[in-house]
Amino acid sequence: MPKTDIARRVYNHTWKLDPIIRSLLDTDFYKLLMLQMIWQLYPDVDATFSLINRTKTVRLAEEIDEQELRDQLDHARTLRFSKKEMIWLAGNTFYGRKQIFSPEFLSWLARFRLPEYELSRRDGQFELTFRGRWVETTMWEIPALAIINELRSRAAMKGLGPFTLDVLYARAKAKMWSKVEQLRQYPNLRISDFGTRRRHSFLWQRWCVEALKEGIGASFSGSSNVLLAMDNDLEALGTNAHELPMVAAALARNDKELAAAPYKVLQDWNQLYGGNLLIVLPDSFGTAAFLRNAPDWVADWTGFRPDSAPPVEGGEKILAWWKKKGRDPRDKLLIFSDGLDVDTIIKTYRHFEGRVRMSFGWGTNLTNDFAGCAPTEIGGLNPISIVCKVSEANGRPAVKLSDNPRKATGDPAEVERYLKFFGTEDFVEQTVRV
């Protein structure tokens, strides 16, 4: 693939629209895996997704031009999966399985387009909402976040001259490469790119992926970004996300169904997938509650992805649970993915080395770390904590608690109800940076 001079590309904006989303494959692989499950098992469920900016001090509607945002969202709605992309999805091997996507699902997917959106402004923030069938609205999450983040980056760099941009990107590349050099010291470490949602830009994420591929070789497991995985002959990686238990819980008609919701979606998942895709995401309503009530068969799954507890503490609790269930943690897998950077990756790896198999999903601090790279401080280049979460399912409020109370989302009254129902054991309040 020819190299792009990112600084020159950023400076030379002579076209009417520079699309941020170039393909519907420019999304995370787990969205496609979940989409097939939703299409098969929940085709008639409605789900609303809402943009949530947890960094309240950043007033997005004052940094990003609303018309530019509309233009990018409208462009994304014109996209369809190409013939080449459909052939790749049908013929490629994912997680050791051929034809992981059924022909019937792919036939439906070939006709897919993103549904309409609702956009308004309130108190300096954008209110961006996607309503409709879950099987359609779910696909807005990743492109919406990528669009918002890249428009913010572009706005921050407007007016910068070509040499300033050269310096900015040269420093960012050097900073990224210094991290690569640290990771090289641990040849058994396994790193994946999980940086699509809050990336600086598509081109920068592509550069980071190519740098990891060359820089750490076999230690680079692949990318969650399907387009970049396809273009760079990498493994497309990802399992499942919080939206599955969030929707299942919202649809629960009584306390018994609410308690069973986190495990019901795992059973649904197991209908379609197996092996290395049997990864548990335990923290939607608190990891302690999940482990306390988990059926014994959950311990037979391949591994866990602790996503909001401090990695060492969260990992230790899962290892202790496996041992309690009579399983050997050395046969299991932990995938760490919450706010990681090279220091926390190395610290966590060294702590658990030899005790459990590990992989690290490196996200925002891989694809959006420009701190100290600009000749003068540019606040708009600092990453923010922004998510696009399910807010309703069939008209009922959806909630996510997590192990960090600051990451909770949902209607405040419903959040309080869930806290009382599931409890707050082992919750650790931490500053949410990304």
From Swiss-Prot:
Keywords: Ligase, Phosphoprotein, Pyridine nucleotide biosynthesis. It comes from the Bacteria. The modification Phosphohistidine is found at residue 242. Catalyzes the synthesis of beta-nicotinate D-ribonucleotide from nicotinate and 5-phospho-D-ribose 1-phosphate at the expense of ATP. Transiently phosphorylated on a His residue during the reaction cycle. Phosphorylation strongly increases the affinity for substrates and increases the rate of nicotinate D-ribonucleotide production. Dephosphorylation regenerates the low-affinity form of the enzyme, leading to product release. It comes from Sinorhizobium fredii (strain NBRC 101917 / NGR234). Pathway: Cofactor biosynthesis; NAD(+) biosynthesis; nicotinate D-ribonucleotide from nicotinate: step 1/1. Belongs to the NAPRTase family. The keyword Phosphoprotein applies. Its EC number is 6.3.4.21. Pfam families: NAPRTase (PF04095), NAPRTase_N (PF17767). The lineage of its organism: Bacteria, Pseudomonadati, Pseudomonadota, Alphaproteobacteria, Hyphomicrobiales. It catalyses: nicotinate + 5-phospho-alpha-D-ribose 1-diphosphate + ATP + H2O = nicotinate beta-D-ribonucleotide + ADP + phosphate + diphosphate. InterPro entries: N/Namide_PRibTrfase, NAPRTase_N, Nic_PRibTrfase, Nic_PRibTrfase-Fam, Nicotinate_pribotase-like_C. One of its GO terms (cellular component) is cytosol. This is Nicotinate phosphoribosyltransferase. Disulfide bonds: none annotated. The keyword S-adenosyl-L-methionine does not apply. GO terms for biological process: NAD biosynthetic process via the salvage pathway. One of its GO terms (molecular function) is nicotinate phosphoribosyltransferase activity.
